């Protein structure tokens, strides 16, 4: 038998990309139903038949007033909720009704975002080699990744990865995974989709479960998609951000700070009051670990994409590292206009940042700055840290 003509090392080298993973396109989508935060307390207590809980309603109004959210989008309409009272009652068995919604709507909303990203990318969808789909709800087999593959008409041989119930840090997770896939598979083009529908967490108020009420004041529905690939073809692909490094860590002494449990009543969340404090206390170390190799220690010299879990988290992070208010502008804009969409938020923020940078005449997609950070915060407490590098804005770029 003749000996092998190539070595394993040569094969591996040929499989790997030359350059870093790059975001090549971004698309976002929301349900049509828009709810304004100023009107939401009256609506929420009316539809859940809880108007007799007057003190709790006043407390909820204060939560909404302090949320820094102007509006949110929700698939659940008043008409639908009126027909599904089990979803409006506090802790009523309702998982079947919720599941019936999300297994259909999660891939549908994800498809809308993916179509926009693929259109901006401008290449045949047959060039998509990998699909990473992330959602907090709607576990089924085959899953939303399969449904989206069918709905978009992707190749049957597309390599799929389905991520369920990761929570609010997962916008960073999907980029970390996409980076590894793109850089270790030469020519790969990874479609990443985060699609979040609050139907699994919506429920009526309870005086004994105020952390659930916090979620009702913050969460919204949305989907975002990005196309990621290394070694972009400059003739037909327009890079937006380079993914330089990515890391995940569990914060010390944070067990139980954020957790969720899927039960007959849907997905229940528990939050400790000290979540903003735990994140801000540890943000310096995360920044140092990520940027020390680059010789960067001025946190106002980089652009920021931070999961907007709530205004207190953003306020305390800003204070801890001495950030100028301008650094969180894109993050606060997404919180204001969409609420907390879990994993999709940071991708919405990337989209807002590159568009606003172009509109404002900035030199780069990162608000005129070269280096940036993307943070995901969620159950664990888990923190995802992604180091980004912007690209120069050319005429017509970054505004699609």
UniProtKB/Swiss-Prot annotation:
Metabolic or biological pathway, per its Swiss-Prot or TrEMBL entry: Secondary metabolite biosynthesis; flavonoid biosynthesis
SUPFAM superfamilies (UniProt xref): Thiolase-like (SSF53901)
Gene3D superfamilies tied to this protein: 3.40.47.10
Any GO MF annotation of the entry: acyltransferase activity, transferring groups other than amino-acyl groups
Chemical reaction(s) catalysed: (E)-4-coumaroyl-CoA + 3 malonyl-CoA + 3 H(+) = 2',4,4',6'-tetrahydroxychalcone + 3 CO2 + 4 CoA
E.C. no: 2.3.1.74
InterPro entries xref list: Chalcone/stilbene_synt_C, Chalcone/stilbene_synt_N, Chalcone/stilbene_synthase_AS, Polyketide_synthase_type-III, Thiolase-like
Swiss-Prot/TrEMBL keywords: Acyltransferase, Flavonoid biosynthesis, Transferase
Pfam families for the chain: Chal_sti_synt_C (PF02797), Chal_sti_synt_N (PF00195)
GO biological process: flavonoid biosynthetic process; polyketide biosynthetic process
Family: Belongs to the thiolase-like superfamily. Chalcone/stilbene synthases family.
Known role: The primary product of this enzyme is 4,2',4',6'-tetrahydroxychalcone (also termed naringenin-chalcone or chalcone) which can under specific conditions spontaneously isomerize into naringenin.
Name of the protein this chain belongs to: Chalcone synthase C2
Organism name: Zea mays
Primary gene name: C2
